[in-house]
Swiss-Prot record:
GO molecular function per UniProt: 4 iron, 4 sulfur cluster binding; metal ion binding; N6-isopentenyladenosine methylthiotransferase activity
Organism, as annotated: Anaeromyxobacter sp. (strain K)
Positions of region (Disordered): 1-24
Complex and partners: Monomer.
Biased composition range(s): Low complexity: 8-18
One annotated Gene Ontology cellular component of this protein: cytosol
Native organism taxonomy: Bacteria, Pseudomonadati, Myxococcota, Myxococcia, Myxococcales
Keywords recorded for this protein, A-Z: 4Fe-4S, Cytoplasm, Iron, Iron-sulfur, Metal-binding, S-adenosyl-L-methionine, Transferase, tRNA processing
Domain TRAM residues, every copy: 401-464
Family that this chain belongs to: Belongs to the methylthiotransferase family. MiaB subfamily.
Its EC number(s): 2.8.4.3
Protein name from the UniProt record: tRNA-2-methylthio-N(6)-dimethylallyladenosine synthase
Subcellular location per the Swiss-Prot or TrEMBL entry: Cytoplasm
Catalysed reactions, semicolon-separated: N(6)-dimethylallyladenosine(37) in tRNA + (sulfur carrier)-SH + AH2 + 2 S-adenosyl-L-methionine = 2-methylsulfanyl-N(6)-dimethylallyladenosine(37) in tRNA + (sulfur carrier)-H + 5'-deoxyadenosine + L-methionine + A + S-adenosyl-L-homocysteine + 2 H(+)
Keyword 4Fe-4S attributed: yes
Length: 464
């Protein structure tokens, strides 16, 4: 239940002044989102909720009456970015009287410290409290507060999305579940997102159908550990149900734990063409000793067995991953094992970072407590990360270069930043800049593209 008593529902002015009349221009909300796809989806839900209460999305904080910072707590650097951003928005508050709110995982974890350290933050709320945002804005006119309790109501855990808010988009996120029941030694997510809760599958399928009705062609099912889904069917069954929705051409999902990669899910990749050949499968380390300390519940051999079964079921599938470098006790040999795994797997992309101790996690508590938990010097960890990133850049470049001359399917998402170009993605989630105009490649169209250039992290091509 919530940490606070229910908020008053009495009629009251909106933030920053009297409630606008029906003819008055709407108040404006600016959302600064940090972190993962789940946060991006949560930010969209917040804007939709406020839109029902006479708020419109602001293009910049300078024109906002309400500034929301939706935060990430996975790494310490994300918290530092939050404090830096808050400093910039302080002037907007002084000039416009804007309310400032902090949401997301940092808010959940550090609510009291935020309110004490940053006196111009008006209210703080956790991920489970998004459904009460309009009420919290009302309350914030009168007092500062934090609302970070776990909510029992499904309406608050999974705020209903308004499909009209997605009109004009080609892709959309759809929440399938939230939370995580794993206890990885480095991860703060169970403390900030709570236990796993799966959204009933009819709700997920209905939202996908509604999105298809307004022109969305690709959906990404999201959750902290989405392939442990238990919302009335298995995750493999959920993918098949979404694939049956008319108008949905492509399906992706994130994020997954290797331990929960079932044979049934591998079969979906083999049998269902709407499920895209792209899988994010975090490994974290190539060392069994490090994986045991991380409490990842698999060995390198077990990870590679799942990896190889995916590749066999869907030849050409693009597999991406995560690495943590400099985890407590990591030796040079442990790191070399991670490099060897990267070379063996040839990941399409890896999101790699130096270990950052997070409050209340096993790794933070045990850091330095025994030889196997000794701290890795920062300089050594950074040097290892640079080697890993260099190897990944080389491999990614080789993969993209291998696409030269091929004809691939591209789902057009809209205009590119470059004049005269359109932007889209291949089934493997590779970004393609297409030399074509809107008439030849309208948003939502799937077009055949001949790849003519591979550079950086994207491809370029022409209509085939």
């Amino acid at each position: 239940m919530s940490d606070l008593v229910p908020l008053s529902r009495k009629p009251a002015p909106a933030a920053g002044g009297p409630a606008p009349s029906p003819a008055a221009p709407p108040r404006k909300v600016y959302v600064h989102t940090f972190g993962c796809q789940m946060n991006e989806s949560d930010s969209d839900r917040m804007v939709e909720l406020l839109g029902r209460h006479a708020y419109a999305r602001a293009a910049s904080a300078d024109e906002a009456d309400l500034i929301l910072l939706n935060t990430c707590a996975v790494r310490e650097k994300a918290e530092q970015k939050l404090l830096s951003a808050l400093g910039r928005y302080r002037e907007v508050k002084a000039r416009r009287g804007a309310l400032i709110a902090v949401s997301g995982c940092v808010a959940q974890q550090e609510k009291d410290r935020l309110l004490a350290r940053v006196p111009y933050v008006d209210f703080v709320f956790g991920p489970d409290n998004i459904g009460r945002l309009p009420e919290m804005v009302e309350r914030a006119r009168d007092e500062r507060f934090a609302e970070t309790g776990w909510m029992d109501s499904e309406e608050y855990v999974f705020p209903r999305a308004d499909p009209e808010a997605a009109r004009g988009r080609v892709t959309a996120f759809v929440t399938a579940m939230k939370g995580c029941d794993n206890v990885c030694a480095f991860c703060i997510v169970p403390h900030t997102r709570g236990r796993e809760v799966s959204r009933p599958f009819p709700d997920v399928v209905a939202e996908c159908a509604a999105l298809a009705g307004v022109g969305v062609r690709e959906v990404t099912l999201i959750g902290q550990n989405v392939n442990s889904y238990t919302g009335g069917c298995t995750f493999a069954d959920l993918l098949r149900r979404v694939a049956a929705v008319p108008g949905i051409d492509r399906i992706r999902f994130t994020t997954s734990h290797p331990h929960d990669l079932s044979d049934a899910l591998v079969e979906v990749f083999r049998d269902e063409p709407k499920v895209m050949p792209h899988f994010h499968l975090p490994v974290q380390s190539g060392s069994d000793a490090v994986l045991r300390r991380m409490r990842r519940d698999y060995s390198v051999a077990e990870y590679l067995d799942r990896f190889d079964r995916l590749r066999a079921a869907r030849p050409g599938i693009a597999i991406t991953t995560d690495f943590i470098v400099g985890f407590p006790g990591e030796t040079d040999a442990d790191f070399e094992a991670s490099l060897a795994l990267l070379e063996r797997a040839r990941f399409e992309q890896s999101f790699s970072f130096v270990f950052s101790p997070r409050p209340h996690t096993v790794a933070a508590v045990r850091l330095g407590s025994a030889p196997e938990w000794r701290d890795v010097p920062r300089e050594a960890a950074v040097a290892r990360l640079e080697r890993l990133l260099a190897a990944q850049r080389r491999i990614a470049g080789e993969i993209l270069a291998g696409e030269l001359g091929k004809v691939v399917e591209v789902l057009v998402e809209g205009p590119s930043d470059e004049p005269g170009e359109r932007l889209g993605r291949t089934p493997e989630n590779r970004v393609v800049h297409l030399a074509a105009d809107e008439a030849a490649a309208p948003a939502g169209a799937r077009v055949a593209v001949r790849i003519t250039r591979a550079g950086g992290s994207s491809l370029s091509g022409t209509l085939a």
